[in-house]
Amino acid sequence: ARIPGEFAFCIPDPAQHAIFGANRNPQLSWSDVPAAARSLVLICYDSDVPTRADDVNQEGRTVPASLPRADFFHWTMVDIAPTVRAIATGACADGVVARGKQSPAGPAGARQGINDYTLWFGGDAAMGGRYFGYDGPCPPWNDELLHHYHFVLLATDLARCPVDGAFTGAQVRAAVEGHVLAEARLTGTYTLNPSVR
């Protein structure tokens, strides 16, 4: 299913190719959490990010679909109580925040790590900073490939995920390895390229 622009960091714009979007986190709900679960972990990532940025958002060029791809983390939340059954639309993110959200809202007791916009905007005077919590899709506007965004909820046997501070999605993936009791996954697609369907 296509991810609505409401949940995107960038939306298509005919004049500038892309502009900032509403950047609201989507509503997510779940059930059937295993009785043995001690905490939940939420990870959202784009599995189609170009591994080279040479052609990204460059006028007169395209990012070829054949280019190798990597994961880009958009949201990592740990220590969600196993009794929580939903996160409301916009409850954790509502708008683009230059230099990143520092203390994003979330379920009581949950902690949110930095997303990969922290790296993407590194060195940018206007946007550089630490981006905690959810920030939505903003694939290259000239990418030939439709991007896939995976929202993954993990039920774990960990009372507290062993990550601290400005933790990353990759660190959380490593920390929960061997501790996952159940997994639920929802995948959506998004593009800023009008020629990609």
Regions found by a protein language model. Give the residues of each.
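N-terminus-centered regions that define maturation/targeting leaders and the start
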Residues: 1-197
